């Protein structure tokens, strides 16, 4: 059997990615594709934990612009991530992979509370663990939650699934001459304000020397390639 380069990963999925071609909500095709790709790497023996955003349902920051109190909006966003987490859990378990959802805000009838040791035990037993409700605190993004959980779970890498094939110096959709980075340092990301993750998440990863790989998850098979050590997308590394 092939041996994975990364044996323990944190996969960060954006809520928007789950929409597919829809304007909001969850595309059954997209979530089934993610589940299939996740099963592929679990079958290789990789320990997989996941954090999903909630932007396909509600985003706290844009809610604040529409008159929703920021703290209330962020709590609404956290609940949106739990909806996405349950949907992904359902899709992964349909493929026969045992999956647990742990939330930063306790909701015992829906999911387990986040307990580090329990989460690690699930991973050791070959279960996928999905972390919902962000960090449980307003003003912190799901990117920061992903960095935090990755550090707590002692993962080898944070893998950020996006709609583009890496990190560019400017928006490749708007600017055809945008330059793609193969590798970039944490400090460059912060200094150039490259839209990878927010500054808090990048700082956490830098402090803990946790590499970040940004890749296009819309092409099936890419997640497996990343885990096997194939260089696709962009890697954020230490200086």
UniProtKB/Swiss-Prot annotation:
**Which Gene Ontology cellular component annotation is one that this UniProt entry carries?**
cytoplasm
Per UniProt, subcellular location reads as: Cytoplasm
Checking InterPro entries in the record gives:
AceGlu_kinase-like_sf (IPR036393), Asp/Glu/Uridylate_kinase (IPR001048), Uridylate_kinase (IPR011817), Uridylate_kinase_bac (IPR015963)
Which residues are listed for UMP binding in this entry? Answer: 54, 74, 135-142
- Catalysed reaction, written as an equation: UMP + ATP = UDP + ADP
- What EC number(s) would the UniProt record show? 2.7.4.22
Keywords in alphabetical order? ATP-binding, Cytoplasm, Kinase, Nucleotide-binding, Pyrimidine biosynthesis, Transferase
- Asked if the record carries the keyword Cytoplasm, the reply is yes
- Record-annotated residues binding ATP? 12-15, 55, 59, 162, 168, 171
* A GO biological process held by the record: 'de novo' CTP biosynthetic process
Notes on activation and inhibition: Inhibited by UTP.
GO molecular function ontology, one term from the record: UMP kinase activity
Record carries keyword Protein biosynthesis = no
Q: What does this protein do?
A: Catalyzes the reversible phosphorylation of UMP to UDP.
Protein family per UniProt: Belongs to the UMP kinase family.
Q: What is this protein called?
A: Uridylate kinase
Per the UniProt record, the source organism is Fusobacterium nucleatum subsp. nucleatum (strain ATCC 25586 / DSM 15643 / BCRC 10681 / CIP 101130 / JCM 8532 / KCTC 2640 / LMG 13131 / VPI 4355)
